[in-house]
A protein has these predicted regions:
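Short edge-strand/loop segments of extracellular domains
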Residues: 186-190
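Conserved, well-structured interaction surfaces
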Residues: 42-72, 95-177, 192-233, 238
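Structural transition elements
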Residues: 191-203, 286-290, 295-297
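Bacterial N-terminal signal peptides
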Residues: 10-16
Length: 362
């Protein structure tokens, strides 16, 4: 089974870099996604400056998956729109306070099918900015050696961060679709073909784990950002990928891969579909070694945690139910919580009646 690269290429073309006439007015975010006038001048501009390269990496961070619907904007993952909703709202994690979110109307009414439109799926294949992030990360990896006066330690860290960003965005989609096309370079726009076979579940998992292993083993990522234990002391960098975050994501990937969703004696949908026959949505049988891999990844993390410290559970000030409940809430509510292994943050602004529709307005 093959998936045409046309969808991927269409998404990636929209992410071309743009050069500006004023060096101090480099545009990122929405403006940064405008179509470039042509040639490689835009790449030369971005990777001709340490500051611009840092800003480019920052723009990639801005397309991570965020747990709350916070803005309806086509430059952001479509699940960021309150109109769409979040997959977590179908679990016991939390609820949407607007009953007409597409996630609710499609699933709870039992009318969800593969023929969905924009905002109607729990995780859209080509509108979650996954492929844009993958392309941007490859652009950074392919061009970072060109950046003049970039400190070697910072360069190594940025490379490791880009690999983590690719891995986490692949995982965001993997848990919904299974095997995915594996992109190993950026596109220039003049390739003769954009067709690529969809990888198996096993190949996709190995691809994500390889990216994380390279980031972890590079030694370029600090264990934590903040003050205390083995943290680097820079609280302004909180939210960037760390060694702890990368190791934790590795545990999560193996856990999903080993779960009955992908790892069982029979395919989730019975085993007769084309996707199941080609092992695109499961491993093709039960494998105990997947749980062994998950266990080892967890043991590796706990061993590092014991040696390095910093992260810990919040403790109740007393033994009452209210005390434990408060400690639990502060674990995810408090911005400086040491329970958080990787923090994804957004910073937006909306005026009254601006139609940007923040989650707090619903």
């Amino acid at each position: 089974m093959k998936l045409g690269y046309k969808l991927l290429f269409g998404a990636c073309v929209a992410a071309n870099l743009v050069a500006t006439s004023c060096v101090d007015d480099m545009k990122f975010g929405n403006s940064f996604l405008e179509k470039a006038p042509g040639g490689s001048a835009t790449i030369d501009t971005v990777f001709g400056s340490v500051i611009y390269t840092q800003q480019f990496l920052n723009s990639i961070y801005g397309r991570q998956y965020y747990g709350l619907p916070y803005k309806d904007d086509t430059s952001l993952p479509v699940s960021s729109s309150p109109y769409c909703g979040k997959i977590e709202a179908l679990t016991d994690c939390w609820q949407l306070h607007w009953r007409d979110a597409q996630l609710y109307t499609q699933y709870y009414s039992g009318i969800h099918t593969a023929n969905y439109g924009r905002r109607q799926d729990k995780f859209c294949y080509n509108d979650e900015k996954v492929w844009e992030v993958v392309r941007w990360c490859w652009l950074l990896l392919e061009n970072i050696d060109r950046v003049p006066n970039l400190d070697e330690n910072e360069k190594a860290r940025m490379i490791a961060e880009a690999k983590c960003l690719m891995a986490v965005r692949y995982f965001d989609m993997f848990r919904h679709y299974g095997g995915l096309p594996l992109l190993t370079a950026s596109f220039e726009g003049n390739e003769s073909s954009y067709e690529c076979p969809r990888a198996t579940v096993e190949e996709t998992v190995n691809f994500m784990i390889k990216l994380l292993d390279e980031a972890i083993n590079s030694g370029a990522l600090p264990w934590a950002y903040g003050v205390g234990d083995d943290a680097d002391g820079s609280s302004t960098y909180v939210g960037r990928w760390t060694m702890a975050g990368a190791m934790a994501l590795k545990c999560k990937i193996w856990q999903f891969a080993a779960s009955p969703l992908f790892n069982d004696n029979q395919g989730y949908a019975g085993g007769a579909s084309e996707a199941e026959q080609q092992h695109l949505v499961w491993y093709g049988g039960y494998r105990q070694e997947l749980w062994d891999n998950c266990l080892k990844a967890c043991e590796d993390f706990m061993r590092e945690l014991q040696a390095r410290g910093f992260y810990e559970l919040n403790h109740s000030v007393n033994t009452t139910p209210a005390g434990y409940r408060y400690a639990y809430r502060m674990g995810y509510l408090y911005q400086g919580s040491k329970e958080v292994l990787h923090s994804v943050r957004v910073q937006m602004g909306d005026a009254f009646n601006s139609s940007t529709y923040f989650w707090h307005n619903w």
